[in-house]
Amino acid sequence: MTTDVKAKNPASIFSHETLLHVLNDLSAHDLAALERVSRSWNSIVRRSSVWHNLYLSEFGTKHLRRHGRIEKKRRNWKGLFRRQSNWKDGRCKKVESMLPQLLNSEKSVGEDRLGLTLTHQNNIYFCNDVQISKWSSVGNSLKCQAISSFRDETVKSGPAVMCLDNASLYIGLKDGNLLHVTVHETGFGNIENLATFSTKFVALSSHKNYICGLTNDNNLYILQHSHQAGTKLKVLGKYHVSSIEKQVAIHFQQSKEGYEVVHVVFNDYVLSGGWTVSLQEFVFNEYCVKSSRLALHDNKDIEYSQQPASAIFMYGSYILTSHPDNSLILQRLYSTNNELRIKFLGRLLGHVCGVQISKLFSCGRIVSVSKNCADICVWDLHDTNYQSIVSPLMLTCTNIHNKPVSDYEKECKVQDIGLYEDTILITLSDGRILKFLFNI
């Protein structure tokens, strides 16, 4: 390994976690050389900001020479990282749209009017405090399939969370109201207000006519939606879970022995190790909740993190967590001797910025997005041995915003990710829809 004595502190270019991943296998001689380059090595430990933002902050007309040196180091580092992580470059074409412009409404401006988006296959459901609409990805554009306006007495605040199961779309509003909309091929059905809760939902999932959600006051509800006249919503179970963080994943499993099963995955802190995830299983029927149990970890291979997961997603028996230390953790839930256990499968390395959100799809692929969309990874898990760490196929999208460099410092959250064939749909909190057509 070659070093430049005149180089700047590596902490001004890379994050501490990135250095740990890349330099994990360096010899003692190489580490000594790095220490000679930077005497203030402790500053790397104290720094947690992403190297990409630091790199961009160095750019300016008065610092072209410095920019050139950092750019050279960045290229050299990316080459080293490719050899270390076995990533591959993906070819992709970016198509960018903005829903408020497509809606062509004067009210669809401002942060409060941007609303919430939900992706399902190649469709995008958009909802704000004015209307709900369904958009379909056709070629390089978005086509409106259906649109319906809310009555003033129905919606008085914007949406906080949405979930979709077959033809039923449930919307949790910020004022605590829970709405139900039937989705048809030609449009939307009647919008009905099922119930009003004390606070808004922060997580929501549905299966058949059952709903499970976590409210902002740490109450977990298991509900049944009755389509008959009279009571629209029946409470099967209510639990106060004060220890659960707001970042949770709720997933319904297939029915067994006449009972429904729902899993709630949440961040959990262990004093002896650090942050991990725990899972609570609830078994219920149309009358009540029968039982609940907590999944156990295999102590031999439990994986900890220094910070809680920024996003949790569950598909089937697989649990996927996104972490600010540039990694994803893949785990699997299994049952043995009447016990639920969580087994660690591998830590997926490939990001250069903290991972904000990731999703596992039925086709066996994972799509993960970094903070501010600095980079996007596609992981192909098809016909892969889950016992080993999976190598990523990476789509590098450094100019994903297609705007001035200063926009990278602006906080922009990813609301949802969709994957349909070879198309990735990413919805952002500022109203933009990013579409990527990639070839593997």
From Swiss-Prot:
Any single GO CC term annotated in Swiss-Prot or TrEMBL for this entry: nucleus
Keyword field contains Cell membrane: no
Subcellular location: Nucleus
Biological process terms in GO annotation: ubiquitin-dependent protein catabolic process
SMART domains (alphabetical): FBOX
Keyword match Glycosyltransferase: no
InterPro entries associated with the record: F-box-like_dom_sf, F-box_dom
Keywords carried by this UniProt record: Nucleus, Ubl conjugation pathway
GO molecular function: ubiquitin-like ligase-substrate adaptor activity
Domain F-box intervals: 8-54
Matching PROSITE patterns: FBOX (PS50181)
Principal location: nucleus
Classification via SUPFAM superfamilies: F-box domain, NHL repeat
Oligomeric and partner information: Interacts with skp1.
Protein's recorded name: F-box protein pof12
Organism of origin: Schizosaccharomyces pombe (strain 972 / ATCC 24843) (Fission yeast)
GN (gene name): pof12
